[in-house]
Amino acid sequence: KGYKFSFDKDMIKTHGPGTKNKYVTIKQAIGDLPSLKTGEEAFEYKQPPFSKYQKEMRKDAPKLTCHKAPNHPENTIKKIKETKPGDPLYNKFKQRIRLSWDDLSPTQVSGGIRPQFQLAHPEDVRGLTIRERCRIQSFPDNFVISGGFVQARVQTGNAVPPLLAEAIALGIKKDNKGVYV
């Protein structure tokens, strides 16, 4: 009754020390995107990509889209300024952090009253743009998100990252000896 499931525990470690795949840091994911102030928007890349991941994300995307900084009230700007990269913005809400260039991203969530600052930019005093959220999730720059900021945040927060979906699909294909289920 029910299903029996087992897996090779070594299969879990696919990235990082001791593997052939390196982690993608925040800097490697979004460090080439133009710096913005609250409410600003950019449509052009200002520098070339400097990581393999950035090159892959930019493929087939001649223009930059969805790179508009959220507007913030003064108290939010003050809170972000006071927070060191890698630290939580609030003691009560540990999932709202200011990202650090050298770290990995925590899970993005879709809900919340103030969606613009679940994750604050490591250097700029603002929340992430939709393009930055997409990049971190492995959506290429030619991927179009529709709707306003909140709707786009819900889409990125609820999404399965494309590179994760690909890895799962390849694992299923490999485990089933190429037979699709």
Region spans (language model):
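Internal helical hairpin/lid segments
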Residues: 69-118
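Hydrophobic, well-ordered secondary-structure elements that form the walls
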Residues: 108, 129, 136, 157, ...
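Short, surface-exposed loop/helix-turn segments at secondary-structure junctions
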Residues: 118-125, 157
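Active-site and glycan-interaction determinants of carbohydrate-active enzymes
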Residues: 143-147
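Generic C-terminus detector
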Residues: 148-181
